[in-house]
Each structure stands twice: as structure tokens, then as C-alpha cells.
From Swiss-Prot:
Keyword RNA-binding: yes
Lineage start: Eukaryota, Viridiplantae, Streptophyta, Embryophyta, Tracheophyta
Listed PANTHER family: MATURASE K
The entry's keywords: Chloroplast, mRNA processing, Plastid, RNA-binding, tRNA processing
Protein name: Maturase K
Localization per record: Plastid, Chloroplast
Gene Ontology biological process: mRNA processing; RNA splicing; tRNA processing
Amino acid sequence: MAEFQGYLELDRSWKPDLLYPLIFREYIYAFAHDHGLNRSNLLENVGYNNKSSLLIVKRLISRMYQQNHFISSANDSNQNQLFGYNKNLYSQMISEGFAVIVEIPFSLRLVSCLKGTEIVKYYNLRSIHSIFPFLEDKFSHLNYVSDVLIPYPIHLEILVQTLRYWVKDASSLHLLRFFLHDYYNWNSFIIPNKYISIFSKSNPRLFLFLYNSHVFEYESILLFLRNQSSHLRLTSSGGFFERIYFYGKIKHPVEEVFANDFPTSLWFFEDFFMHYVRYQGKSILTSKDTPLFMNKWRYYLVLLWQCHFSVWSQPGRMYINQLCKHSLSFLGYLSNMQINLSVVRSQMLENSFLMDNAMKKIDTLVPISPLIGSLAKMRFCNVLGHPVSKSTWADSSDFDIIDRFAYICRNLFHYYSGSSKKNSLYRVKYILRLSCIKTLARKHKSTVRTFLKRLGSKLLEEFFTEEEEVLSLIFPRTYSALRSSYKGRIWYLDIFCINDLVNHK
């Protein structure tokens, strides 16, 4: 954001409330290109090289000043030729530049909010593993859990209306509608999954921004409920729903559905004890209260999605389970509640008696079946878990092949270091090791037995260093005490993206 701020200060024609003029600035496309978003699709696939990219941007800006190029026919998609024969190139360039521009209001607000605060203090909270210590600390005191998949809006105008609260520039909103119309069929109310997939791959930055703005709108309402929970008894249902911007749409549903739950005050939120955790599109709601409390929350969320976001959702698809009887699948881990019973002898004066003491503990396991399914999808093994050679890597050098397999193996052990039982990981390690050997044997046109007999089985040992050995090298003095106290379960605070675990760089 500091790079943007320097250019924006020099650009005196830009005003904070007007984003549309920035689409005519060359440095915006330079930023989008430098971030590496779809660089191959932007230049290489259309026959251009990096040296002529500046000429392409200048040609694009000169054509954008001709307003007739933005006139499109909504009835005939074949006639909607954006900028002539370079439709795909120019449309993608503008959408990437627009993705950079539309983030500016959010970035400026974030910078203003963080002024004078210690950002380093919250750096560890960015890690995916920071969620699991929270679950271990809180879930042992809770009773019920509900898995919630956040639905995506089926009408594209919902995304535009969500951004309207933050982006005051009407021209930018119209341009966003133009992009969405260019990617989808605007006459259809339901977005097919293939269009979402195409859009997310062609411009992931804009897609993630739109999705995050949608989730932010949804979570801001939940945050409002959480912060106002102690004052809800004095708030009527009509006034309450008006404060969250959808009173007009749900006036009648409130009278019909919540007639019994909201007589004159919102007693429904008494004794509020709710925890909320989300990663990407999956969230978890947990409570210590009764199933009736969770059931009312479920119907409230369904009504919120239907009336405020125009998303149809069925309450029956949001299951409410007891933590002690249900395994929770989240972020690649399988978590369940373990109850450890112990007998304690207590003595009072001359009388002694036995007491049963139950200790609740969250146990995190590695789901082996999904892992093998992922390895089979990447062609490291078959569906039964039998290792096979990676034929697409056979043309690489021996060191590169070993390094690729070792990279995936080390990162899997790194991510699943918090598992209480690592037997499943050793099976994954066996699959990757044998797949690596078969790939090397295939490259040298030999059998696995002959290849190992010639080079020895210790060939791969230095590349498949286990997590515990790495820790002993980093912390040689304190590792023995750490191992005895922590029993091998370690949560790391440097994992920010799951995709980084498998993408070899």
C-alpha cells in the first residue's frame, strides 16, 4: 500500500472518492503485472512478450478514451467484441487493474485503523495454526457445534450492492457490472459453477476481493449481534432489523417466522455464549447452551441469507451435533472430543470416598483417506494408496525430482505437526518416497530393485528429514525438554496459506 500511496500523492487529479480515473493510469497496470497475477495468460498466451507490455498498456488506454468500445449488446453476446480482436487480452488487463484499484478504499481504511498500533503483535494470528490452540482452549467447555458453509450469492447484483457501501464512485460500480456481464450471462439469475471456476482462474484477485467483501458483509452483521448482545432486551425486533439494513425486505418474515421468538424484546440472545471460527467458505458455530439456542441461530442465519443476500439455503443442511459424539473436519484436520475418566480418592476426616473426574480434551487427527485421495489426484499413487511413478517429472534432473518430493513431504509433516497420532503421516511419507524412487527408476529405464541396489537406500534420507530432527537442529539445547513436555504436538505460526505447502517454488 505504501507504493500506491506514493503514486496517489503525485497524482493530484485523483480524489479519494473517485476511483474511475485511476483506470487510465499506466502505473496501475504495472502494479497488477508486478504482482504476478495471470502473467502467462496476460502476455504469453496471446503472442506478446514482456518488452512490448508498455505499448499494450498505452494502446489500451488510448482505446478506452473511445467510449463507443464500451457499448455492448446484452441481447447478442457474439456482437459484444470488447476492443476488437484483442477482447480477451484487454478485458483481462482492465479487470486486473480494476482489482488493484477497488482495493484502495479498503487499504486506506485499514492503514488508518492500524496507525499507532503494534502490528507485529498480531502477526502470529495470521497463521492457520493459530486457530487450533483457540479450539483446544475453548471447545473443551462447549457442548454443541454446527458446520456452516457460507453460500455464495446467486445474483451478481448482490456483490455490486455490497460494494456500494464502501465504494462511492458510481462509475466504478458500473465498470464492475460490465466485467461481470462480460464473464457471465447477465440475463441468467443463477451462476453455473463452471462460470465461477472460469472467473476465479482468469482473475483470482478480483474474484477473491468480491468474495471477501461478501463474507465481510455477512460477518459484520454477526459482529454487530455479538457486540450488542447485552442490549438486545431493550430493542424491539423492528428497530433491531432496521439497524442492519434489511428491515424492508424481511418485514413480513419477521412477523411470521419470529412471532413466537421475538414478542417485544429479543430474549433469544440471553446468556450469549457463542464462538465463531471461519476459514475461506467454511465456518463453525459452537455454544455451551441448549440445542434450542443453536436451532434458533440456525433459522436466523437462513433468514439472513435469504432476505439480505437473496441466497436460498435450507435449515436442514446445517447440522447441529454434540461435540462429544461428533468429529469435526476443519482445515485438513479431524478433531473430536475425548473424555478421559480418572478416579480420585478423597478423604475428609475419617471418611474416604472415590470421585470420578472427567477431563475433556480436543484430539486432532490426520484424515488418511482424504490425503490419499489428494495424492491419487496428483498421480503419486492410485486410489488404493499404492505408489506410482510421476511421469510428468521424469524429464527433470535427479536432484530436482528428489527436491520436489522432499518439499511436499516436509511441508505435510510441518502442517500436520499438531496431530496427536502421526501413523497416517508415515504412510504418506512411504507413498511419496516410493513414488520418488519409481520416478527416478523410470527416468533411468530401470526397475526399482535394480535402482536401489545400485545407488543404495540411503539416497533419499537427507531429503526426507523428519520434523523432530529439524527441531533438534534448530533448538539443540531446549528440544529434549520441549519434546518431553509437549509430546510432539507443535502448532506453527508461520503457515499463512495451505496452497504454499504443495506449490514448489
